[in-house]
């Protein structure tokens, strides 16, 4: 789940408000970061993301790969409320951020270099809870600053965090290229609840009605596409098995649509062989 309603406006608020309200704080970070234990790399990242107190976290075994993609993972030690307080990114400890960073990094490294360049992602900020207003959300895409704030919460489920990371990255791609509201998709696919009902907050494959990968995909069209994107990167064989087992022609068409859209936006082919 991500902030959707008025996303373009909200993103502009976020970027402009941060630049206006955090300017002096970022200068303070640059001047006093060393005294607070921040490394020069932390200080630079805080300046570029406009998040005072930001710290970078290393991920053993994949740091080199992330470096070749140009992505850094960070966290904040104190709650921050960017966008004039409209958004919330909760604080994390070093230990918790290091634990969460491993599956997040594993998900990021599934993307090829060209896709990351097209997406323009440079920073992923791990949050101990993320909100838009009072509503919990999975992530906060901020394309103008080339960053994604990601709620890693209290979950220790590595598979879940990988799926959430790729789900939110797809939201960022659609926001970046102004295709979150996809009229062509809307003409071809229907049946959405247009709400986050509790009984739809299930991500297991096969938990949804025909035409949907899972129950969560039934909430909104953009959530449907993001669920497919993540699943096609993480478990393409399982998606293919579900389509074959159910002979679901609608789900098959959705996979092909997301495959074509992903190739157009990110130069990334997703459809499994044999579809």
Predicted features along the sequence, with ranges:
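Residue-identity detector for glycine
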Residues: 6-8, 33, 37
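Bacterial N-terminal signal peptides
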Residues: 20-30
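Secreted/luminal cysteine- and crosslink-motif detector
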Residues: 14-16, 32, 90, 128
């Amino acid at each position: 789940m991500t902030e959707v309603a008025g996303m373009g406006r909200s993103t502009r608020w976020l970027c402009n408000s941060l630049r206006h309200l955090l300017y002096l704080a970022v200068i303070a970070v640059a001047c006093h970061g060393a005294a607070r234990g921040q490394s020069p790399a932390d200080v630079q990242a805080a300046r570029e993301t406009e998040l005072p107190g930001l710290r970078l976290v290393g991920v053993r075994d994949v740091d080199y790969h992330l470096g070749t993609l140009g992505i850094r993972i960070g966290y904040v030690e104190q709650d921050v409320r960017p966008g004039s307080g409209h958004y919330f990114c909760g604080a994390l400890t070093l230990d918790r951020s290091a634990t969460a960073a491993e599956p997040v990094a594993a998900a990021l490294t599934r993307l090829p270099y060209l896709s990351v360049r097209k997406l323009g992602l440079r920073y992923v900020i791990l949050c101990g809870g993320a909100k838009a207003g009072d509503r919990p959300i999975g992530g906060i895409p901020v394309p103008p600053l080339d960053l994604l704030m990601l709620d890693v919460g209290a979950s220790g489920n590595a598979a879940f965090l990988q799926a959430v990371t790729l789900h939110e990255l797809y939201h960022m791609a659609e926001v970046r290229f102004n295709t979150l509201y996809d009229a062509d998709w809307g003409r071809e696919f229907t049946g959405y609840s247009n709400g986050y009902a509790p009984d739809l907050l299930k991500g297991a494959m096969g938990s949804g009605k025909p035409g949907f990968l899972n129950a969560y995909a039934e909430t909104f069209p953009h959530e449907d596409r993001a669920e497919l994107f993540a699943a096609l990167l993480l478990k393409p064989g399982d998606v293919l098995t579900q389509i074959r087992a159910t002979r679901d022609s609608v789900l098959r068409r959705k996979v092909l649509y997301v495959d074509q859209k992903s190739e157009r936006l990110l130069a990334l082919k997703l459809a499994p062989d044999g579809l």
